């Protein structure tokens, strides 16, 4: 398992909360981050593994 950090973004795209998660691969981590973001007040998220930005998904309105 690999460790990832999901940074929840506010409407100005600043991180207001960080949640760790462990997943088998990037694809699984992106799915998990989407689920966590959908169940929060976030306006998007960034997914990081160490210093690598795996995925960034700001919400579009």
What are the language-model segments listed below?
Residues 24-42:
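A short, charged, amphipathic alpha-helix used as a generic interaction element across diverse proteins
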């Amino acid at each position: 398992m690999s460790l990832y950090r999901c940074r929840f973004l506010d409407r100005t795209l600043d991180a207001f909360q960080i949640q760790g998660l462990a997943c088998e691969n990037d694809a699984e981590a992106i799915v998990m981050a989407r689920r966590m973001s959908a169940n929060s007040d976030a306006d998007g998220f960034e997914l990081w593994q160490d210093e690598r930005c795996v995925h960034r998904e700001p919400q579009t309105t």
